[in-house]
Amino acid sequence: MKHNKKAGRVFWCHLAETAVLGALLLCVGAVRGHRVCTQHDITRIPDTSFQSYAAPAAADATGSGQKIVCLTFDDGPSSTTPLVLETLRQKQVPATFFVMAADNNRKYLPLIQTETENGHQIALHTASHEYKKIYQSPESYWQDIAELLQAISPYTDTEKIRYLRFPGGSTNTVSRKYGGSDIMKCLKAQAQEKGYRYIDWNVCAEDAAGGHPSAEEIYRNILREAQNQTVCVVLMHDTAATKNTAKALPDVIDWFREQGYRFCTVEQMDRSCTQSPPNS
């Protein structure tokens, strides 16, 4: 099932609601409209971004003109994940992995231990990624999160995980079909009550779009959307179907470096990047 493309880009969620100033601003003002991620199959990947309005904030992330990029990968681990990890190791770049634990990727869950040992951030994306299931009710969503935490607990310290990304983004409208018009509002409030931070993205690789875009197309998509942005949270996928993302990744990293960006995990960004990433 496809959804119409909409202008705008989701970025910070409740971080944007509480604009944090200091060495790093945790939210970015509304960005200019352009192409967004499209969703092919709402029960699985890819994610979709919908129009959102981030809390107003200065675009300068640090007050000194420093540019920051967070590379984020959804829907893994999979057979593609080792390729991504190898590039990140070679380039000495941290990333944030929003993991799931569906039937088709459970055998790859031990890779989460490798991600953790390599200094990457593990965050939550639900176990099943099935919209009909997770967005049926708040109880269904948190039950799915509980299943994910249980599945990944042998490979990482789940007590330390405080970040998540809602499938479809925090302002998705698909969820209304299953849980009513207030389902996302309720889930965001509950996430905050439970001590979670939720984050979307403002740069989309469109790597999970229909037709399996080439590595060159993925590279161009990212560059197009990252142009003139001081803070970039890049949405990519490390699924079996997105091996071209792994092929594009070295060039993507090189471009951000050439443009003077500093690489951070989402948590490092949240902490104003007080913990220096490997490449700094």
Labelled PLM ranges:
Residues 1-70, 86-95, 154, 202, ...:
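Terminal accessory/targeting
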Residues 8, 22, 29, 33, ...:
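Residue-identity detector for glycine
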Residues 40-161, 271-272:
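Active-site beta->alpha N-cap acidic-glycine motif
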Residues 129-235, 239-255, 261-262, 268-269, ...:
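Catalytic domains of cell-wall/extracellular-matrix polysaccharide-remodeling enzymes
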